Amino acid sequence: MRAMIVDDSRAQRMLLKRAVAPLGFEVIEAENGEDALSKLDTDDPVDVMLVDWNMPVMDGLALVRRVRATRAFADVFVMMVTSESDPKKMARALMVGADDYLVKPVDGDMIRSKLEQTSAMSGRLA
């Protein structure tokens, strides 16, 4: 299984990596949406993306739109992990294609719990 962590904060990427790697994910890191798109492989897509909203170059919302517009990535589970706590922004992220939304700060246990719950419910990560 492969997970991509997209966040302009190196510290945040490390925190998220420590949370998902023990679940058996090979982790790919990207600093912004454009970097993430350049690292996505249509022949071997990731299973999960953890995406920040506020990033330079291409923000998380634009990235989610692009991912959802690409047939090869239709089944990727996308979780926004961001400091944006406005309910309207949460709804907007879900409307453009995010599967879940967590507000920072989050801890590793919270991320692991969400991914395990998603796996158990949908079988998408199993």
Question: How would you label these PLM feature ranges?
Answer:
Residues 14-22:
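Charged docking surfaces used in two-component/phosphorelay signaling
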Residues 29-48:
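Acidic, metal-coordinating helix/loop segments flanking the phosphotransfer/catalytic sites
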Residues 52, 82:
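Active-site residues of response regulator receiver
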Residues 55:
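Receiver (REC) domain active-site loop signature in two-component systems and cognate sites
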Residues 106-115:
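C-terminal output helix
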Residues 116-126:
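The C-terminal output helix
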